[in-house]
Amino acid sequence: IDNFKRLNDELGHSAGDEALKALAATVSKTLRPTDMVARYGGEEFVVLLPETPVDEGQQILTRLQRSLSGGLFMHEQKQIFVTFSAGITAYRTGERIEDALERADLALYQAKRAGKNRTLIG
């Protein structure tokens, strides 16, 4: 989630929790039954899109971004706008999963540096 630390610092951890819930609700409505999502740490998640080409995966995550940023959630009578950045990669047969996660993580940080609320391929 973009600017998650600032959200927590300025509005409190309950606002951060609500942002995570808003993201989870959006994910559950958008992803396919075969897709999986897991919290990776803090405000970072891993989304597994089995049998999905990387360009199609990028389109799926872009749809997720539009769905999340298309709606606001309320926290203590304030409307909160939430976005997220994502890095995407394809798992290469025989590689360590950590290597794929590292590529996705690098792409994530490139997306954040490039202005946030975007998905880049790593």
Predicted regions and their residues:
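Hydrophobic pocket-lining residues within nucleotide cofactor-binding pockets
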Residues: 1, 52, 73, 91
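Catalytic-core segments of nucleotide cyclases and related cyclic-nucleotide turnover enzymes
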Residues: 54, 58, 62, 90-121
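Residues at secondary-structure transition points
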Residues: 10, 14-18, 55, 74-77, ...
